[in-house]
Design a protein with these regions (language model features):
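Catalytic cores of nucleic-acid endonucleases
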Residues: 112-163
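Solvent-exposed, charged helical/coil patches
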Residues: 31-32, 38-79, 83
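Charged, structured surface patches that assemble and position nucleic-acid processing machinery
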Residues: 138, 163-176
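Nuclease-adjacent, charged terminal/linker segments that flank catalytic cores
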Residues: 1-49
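Acidic-and-aromatic substrate-binding clefts and catalytic sites of carbohydrate-active enzymes
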Residues: 5-7, 85-89, 115-117, 149-152
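Hydrophobic, Leu/Ile/Phe/Ala-enriched alpha-helical segments that form helix-helix packing faces
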Residues: 4, 16-20, 65-73, 126-134, ...
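Active-site metal-binding core of divalent-cation-utilizing nuclease and nuclease-like domains
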Residues: 68-104, 114-116
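Conserved beta3 VAIK motif of the Hanks protein kinase fold
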Residues: 108
């Protein structure tokens, strides 16, 4: 509502009611969550790939990350970051990537229930990427943003970031 400045709750409900043929609705916590159904995707010329309910919480946290990072325009969802180390091609697939006004790479990882071992493997790759990026971009570092849901996970992620010497910002968003 606040992103699109559509006024009050009654107006928002009226708009959502008008869009009903193109939307699916579910409850998340105590709020309704609306998302495009197959017809809604077709309206925009997309392939009709609908977010499954199992991935809905992940998608919502990714949307919260977008809002928290001031709505970057060039947001790319699950797009590869490719690099070469020791003549071997490697890649990382963050949940989101974008560049800021200084053209610095930002990668966003949404961590709701991922095993810490998987996060550790990701941070090892980000360590490699950081070293290569630093050399290519005059000492500048890529920024890795982790959005998680508990203080415990925040602490563990910060420990791993220190261990692998990666510039990581960890945010706790407990409402999702």
């Amino acid at each position: 509502m606040s992103v699109h400045d559509i006024g009050g709750i009654r107006n928002a409900n009226r708009i959502m009611r008008d869009l009903k043929p193109y939307l699916s609705k579910t409850m998340q916590g105590k709020e309704y969550v609306y998302y495009l159904n197959k017809e809604g995707h077709a309206l925009f010329g997309e392939d009709g790939k609908v977010v499954s309910r199992g991935k809905l919480a992940h998608a919502l946290l990714r949307n919260e990350a977008w809002l928290h990072l001031f709505c970057p325009d060039d947001l790319q969802i699950e797009t590869d970051i490719r690099y070469i180390k020791n003549k071997e091609k490697k890649k990382i697939v963050p949940d989101v990537k974008f560049r800021d006004e200084e053209n610095i790479l930002h990668a966003v990882e949404v961590d709701r229930s991922q095993k810490m071992k998987v996060n550790e493997e990701k941070l090892k790759k980000y360590e490699e990427l950081t070293q290569i990026y630093k050399q290519k971009h005059n000492g500048k570092l890529p920024v890795i943003h982790f959005f998680t849901v508990t203080k415990y996970r925040e602490k563990k992620l910060e420990e791993l970031a220190r261990m692998y010497d990666v510039f990581v910002k960890v945010y706790v968003i407990a409402s999702i």
